[in-house]
Curated annotation (Swiss-Prot):
The lineage of its organism: Bacteria, Pseudomonadati, Pseudomonadota, Gammaproteobacteria, Alteromonadales. The gene is epmA. It catalyses: D-beta-lysine + L-lysyl-[protein] + ATP = N(6)-((3R)-3,6-diaminohexanoyl)-L-lysyl-[protein] + AMP + diphosphate + H(+). Homodimer. Gene3D superfamilies: Bira Bifunctional Protein, Domain 2. Substrate binds at S75, P76, E77, Y117, E250. One of its GO terms (cellular component) is cytosol. GO terms for biological process: lysyl-tRNA aminoacylation. Its EC number is 6.3.2.-. PROSITE patterns: AA_TRNA_LIGASE_II. This is Elongation factor P--(R)-beta-lysine ligase. The keyword Ribosomal protein does not apply. It holds the Pfam family tRNA-synt_2.
């Protein structure tokens, strides 16, 4: 049977539902006096996260005859934090983000992200606000909350905060990942493998579930918790086999943030991965001063999938990567 590749991958009826959801999200924030902003999709720097790959290109123009390397952003986070440091107050953005990774039922290399930041909030206050939005858009019961440690122990019987590399390798072998475990010496890679493949499928099956207090080694751009230096003020939201959101009690210390970027790039160098330019504008903004705040990135396409009961991301976007 022939396929009309000129036609949208989503039905017009679904795209109309999507438009209503986007309008509802905007109204949610307008009612709370959260300002909508726009930031660049192209930047001279990008995320250093070792698990993310950015698209990059070269800009050839006045003053850049040999080409200026630019990256499509995996998230608007860095630029939005610069706005916060400049005194914007609470802000949100609906935008395209780009990740050079696989396409599948839950992934498209170009996708729509909702990101927002709340000065004066910690991760728990932000989780409560996200929960309100989930109830509005998905008409679901209030979310539940689990610590990363409890979720991991409940399914796999091992404390992820105290487990040694050898214990994680053994557990991964027992769970059917011997081909990876026998050569893996990075503790967090094993933690993420086990959590993704074995723990995540058990979370949020009946109602949305926040998993919080991720290991400090996976803090990314979150603060380390004052009460327990083994964990970070980071959380993720899961519902019906999908990771919907990733949020932080934001790191505001410029020195620590620069160290984390450098550590990522050192790991990249040692493991044959491309090093990524550190966002010096973000570091300068943190040096200027970023007030305590919490922020979150939420995948709009996956949210629409849940709201419209679709099983593939291409069913909720106008043109997936095969038709773009």
């Amino acid at each position: 049977m022939s396929v009309n590749l000129w036609a949208p991958s989503a039905s017009i009826a679904t795209l109309k539902q999507r438009a209503v959801i986007l309008r509802s999200i905007r109204e949610f924030f307008y009612a709370r006096n959260v300002m909508e902003v726009e930031t660049p999709s192209l930047s001279g720097a990008s995320v250093t996260d070792i698990h993310l790959v950015s698209f990059n290109t070269r800009f050839v123009g006045p003053g850049h005859a040999s080409g200026l390397e630019l990256y499509l952003q995996t998230s608007p986070e860095f630029a939005m934090k610069r706005l916060l440091a400049a005194g914007s107050g609470p802000i949100f953005q609906l935008c395209k983000a780009f990740r050079n990774e696989e396409a599948g039922s839950h992934h498209n290399p170009e996708f729509t992200m909702l990101e927002w930041y709340r000065p004066g909030f910690d991760e728990f206050a932000l989780m409560a606000e996200i929960d309100e939005l989930m109830q509005l858009i998905l008409d679901v019961a209030p979310s539940e909350r689990l610590t990363y440690q409890h979720a991991f122990e409940q399914v796999l019987g091992l404390d992820p905060l105290t487990a040694s590399l050898e214990q994680l390798q053994q557990l991964a072998c027992e769970q059917g990942f011997a081909d990876i475990a026998k050569n893996e010496t990075h503790r967090d890679t094993l933690l993420q493998l086990l959590f993704c493949m074995k723990v995540e499928p058990t979370i949020g099956q009946h109602k949305p579930c926040f998993v919080y207090h991720f290991p400090a080694s996976q803090a990314a751009l979150a603060q380390i918790c004052d009460h327990d230096s083994r964990v970070a003020g980071r959380f993720e939201l899961y519902y019906k086999n999908m990771e919907l959101a990733n949020g932080f009690n934001e790191l505001t210390n410029a020195t620590e943030q620069a160290k984390r970027f450098n550590d990522d790039n050192e790991y990249r160098k040692q493991n044959g991965l491309k090093q990524v330019p550190m966002d010096k504008h973000l570091i300068a903004a943190l040096e200027h001063g970023l007030a305590p705040c919490a922020g979150v990135a939420l995948g709009i396409d996956r949210l629409v999938m849940l709201a419209t009961q679709k099983s593939n991301i291409k069913e909720v976007i106008a043109f997936d990567v095969t038709r773009a």
